[in-house]
């Protein structure tokens, strides 16, 4: 079982997200109040707490949300999961739609550290069923679909 460490949003695109502790997830939209919400395949982004901690151990001073992630979750290496994996936290159900992303311009973290983990460690989901998620109260079970996708290379979208 995983545990949500942080729930983060930003009201404007291009700004770091801030940990708000709890947020409302809206079906086929994303997180209420988050600038990246919308009818597309990258409604909610997830990043492994362990990957963030490993990056901090290299000397990075980063707050939760600094990489643009909505959920920081302990207990999973998200990039190893196949497209279509489903996550449940209370009433909220998310479906994995993309692993990794292309970084078009280097963020402030990259400029300071020479690296950013979000493009290779972050994953994106869409909201299948809405509700509220609060930090440190994750009771999800990862459900793998019976039929795995034919493709699933990093960055591919299957929706």
Model-predicted segments: where are they?
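Metal-cofactor-dependent catalytic cores
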Residues: 1-159
């Amino acid at each position: 079982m995983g545990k949500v460490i942080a729930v983060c949003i930003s009201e404007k695109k291009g700004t770091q997200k801030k940990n708000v502790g709890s947020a409302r997830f809206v079906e086929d939209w994303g997180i209420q109040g988050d600038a990246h919400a919308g009818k597309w395949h990258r409604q909610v982004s997830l990043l492994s707490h362990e990957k963030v901690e490993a990056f901090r151990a290299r000397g990075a001073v980063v707050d939760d949300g600094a990489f643009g992630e909505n959920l920081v979750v302990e207990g999973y290496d998200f990039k190893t999961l196949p497209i279509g994996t489903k996550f449940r936290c209370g009433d909220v159900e998310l479906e994995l739609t993309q692993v990794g992303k292309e970084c078009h311009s280097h963020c402030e973290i990259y400029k300071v550290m020479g690296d950013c983990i979000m493009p290779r460690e972050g994953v994106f989901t869409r909201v299948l069923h809405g509700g509220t998620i609060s930090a440190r109260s994750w009771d999800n079970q990862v459900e793998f679909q019976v039929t795995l996708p034919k493709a699933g290379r990093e960055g591919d979208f299957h929706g």
